[in-house]
C-alpha cells in the first residue's frame, strides 16, 4: 500500500503541485462551489466547510476541468499537511494532524445524490480515502432531511467503513451540536455562526484564515481577498 502511495506521488509529481500549481480560477470556482478552510475547532483542528447545496457541477466545469480540480484537491491536502497542520500545532503546542469538515446539504435531493453531484463528491472522496485517509477527524453533514437520510446508505456504500464511522448527520437545528465542538465565533454566518470575516472580499469561505494564516486572504496573481492586503508580498503563503 505504501509503495503504491509513493508511486502515485512520483507519477503525479505531487511535491511540485503544492508550490507550483497555480489554480487561478479559484475565485470563479468558489462562486459556483462555495468551500474553504476557516479557523479551528475547540481542539485546534482546521475547519473545512463546503456549501454542497450550492454546487452546480455543470457550471463548475465551464470555468475549470475535472483534471484541474483533482490537482487542486491534491494541492490543498498537501498544504493542509505542510502548512495548516503545523500552524495549528504551534498554536496549541501539541500535534494537530486531523481536520473537522462541515458539509451543508440543505436542498440536496435524489437528483443530487445520483447525478453529476454524486460523481463529483465521489471523486473528491476517493482522493481523500486513497491518499490522505487519516486526515479526517470528524465530518458533520448539516440540514440532512428525511430523504437525504434515506439515501445515505447509497453514498455510504462507496466509502471506507472507518471513514464512514467519522461522519455524523445533523438536521436543521445543528448549531446546538456544532457549538459543542466549535466556538460560535469561529463558525461562519453562512451556516448560522457569528463570524462574518468582514475584511475578506467574499466572506468567510474566501478567507483561509487560521493559525497558519492569521490575517486571512487568498492570493490569486496580484489580487488578494483580504481587503487590507495589496500584493503577494503582504500575504502569508504556503512553504
Task: Tell where the protein language model's regions lie, with residue ranges.
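Basic, amphipathic alpha-helical/coil surface patches used to engage anionic, phosphate-bearing ligands
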Residues: 1-239
Amino acid at each position: 500500500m505504501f509503495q503504491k502511495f509513493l508511486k502515485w506521488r512520483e507519477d503525479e509529481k505531487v511535491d511540485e503541485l503544492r508550490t507550483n500549481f497555480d489554480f487561478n480560477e479559484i475565485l470563479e470556482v468558489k462562486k459556483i462551489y462555495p468551500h474553504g478552510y476557516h479557523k479551528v475547532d475547540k481542539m485546534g483542528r482546521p475547519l473545512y466547510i463546503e456549501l454542497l447545496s450550492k454546487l452546480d457541477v455543470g457550471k463548475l466545469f465551464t470555468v475549470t476541468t475535472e483534471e484541474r480540480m483533482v490537482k487542486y484537491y491534491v494541492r490543498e491536502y498537501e498544504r493542509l499537511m505542510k502548512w495548516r497542520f503545523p500552524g495549528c500545532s504551534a498554536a496549541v503546542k501539541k500535534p494537530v494532524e486531523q481536520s473537522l469538515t462541515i458539509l451543508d446539504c440543505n436542498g440536496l435531493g435524489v437528483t443530487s445524490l445520483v447525478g453529476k453531484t454524486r460523481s463529483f463528491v465521489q471523486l473528491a472522496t476517493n482522493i481523500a480515502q486513497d491518499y490522505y485517509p487519516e486526515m479526517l477527524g470528524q465530518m458533520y453533514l448539516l440540514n440532512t432531511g428525511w430523504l437525504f437520510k434515506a439515501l445515505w446508505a447509497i453514498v455510504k456504500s462507496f466509502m471506507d467503513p472507518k471513514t464512514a464511522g467519522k461522519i455524523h448527520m445533523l438536521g436543521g437545528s445543528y448549531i446546538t451540536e456544532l457549538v459543542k465542538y466549535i466556538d460560535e465565533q469561529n463558525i461562519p454566518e453562512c451556516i448560522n455562526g457569528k463570524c462574518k470575516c468582514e475584511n475578506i472580499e467574499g466572506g468567510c469561505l474566501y478567507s483561509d484564515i487560521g493559525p497558519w494564516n492569521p490575517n486571512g486572504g487568498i492570493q490569486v496573481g496580484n489580487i488578494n481577498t483580504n481587503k487590507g492586503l495589496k500584493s503577494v508580498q503582504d500575504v502569508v503563503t504556503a512553504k
